[in-house]
Design a protein with these regions (language model features):
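Active-site-proximal cap/lid insertion segments
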Residues: 1-167
């Protein structure tokens, strides 16, 4: 991106999908796939972070998730993408992870609402769902959410209280 005319924060950000997004810590590629590939080799901090992420996931989910992300490591080893080709993969994987997260939230909010309906609790229960500000989804080539620009200053809000608020 051309940084002329932008403030310091814009110029010094470390949110570039191509240059700053880490394969292991941000995209969950097992470091074992990358250790002998100099162009992708993760540093110790990235390896530690990856292990911390995986250790928080209980079995058998951890094995299932690692299998899903194994495809990424295999692709990197086989194709060794660089430049725009690597950017394309990173962005696709980032969006797949983001959309999987959104789908999971949708599914589980639905489970809560279904439970309330099935137990006749809907009319007297307010359900309020919100979250923090949104992520950059490739705008300006960025990911994450470190700066307060308009694109990321949106928060989800869902309220359901049929006994009090009309839909």
């Amino acid at each position: 991106n051309d940084t002329a005319g932008h403030g310091t924060a814009w110029r010094v950000q470390t949110m570039s999908i191509l240059h700053d997004m880490k394969l292991s810590s941000d995209l969950k590629v097992d470091p074992a796939f990358l250790m002998d590939l100099p162009e992708y080799k993760p540093d110790e901090k990235e390896i530690t972070y990856y292990k911390a992420i995986m250790n928080r996931i209980p079995e058998p989910d951890r094995s299932r998730i690692k299998k899903i992300y194994e495809e990424r490591g295999l692709l990197l080893r086989e194709k060794r993408p660089a430049g725009k080709e690597l950017l394309k993969y990173k962005y696709q994987w980032y969006m797949q992870d983001y959309l999987a997260c959104v789908a999971s939230v949708d599914e589980n909010v639905g489970r809560v609402l279904d439970y309330l309906d099935q137990h006749q609790l809907t009319q007297n229960t307010m359900v309020l769902y919100t979250g923090d500000q949104g992520m950059y989804l490739g705008e300006n080539g960025w990911f994450d959410k470190r700066w307060m620009y308009e694109v990321s200053m949106q928060a989800p809000l869902l309220i359901r209280w049929p006994g009090k608020i009309r839909a």
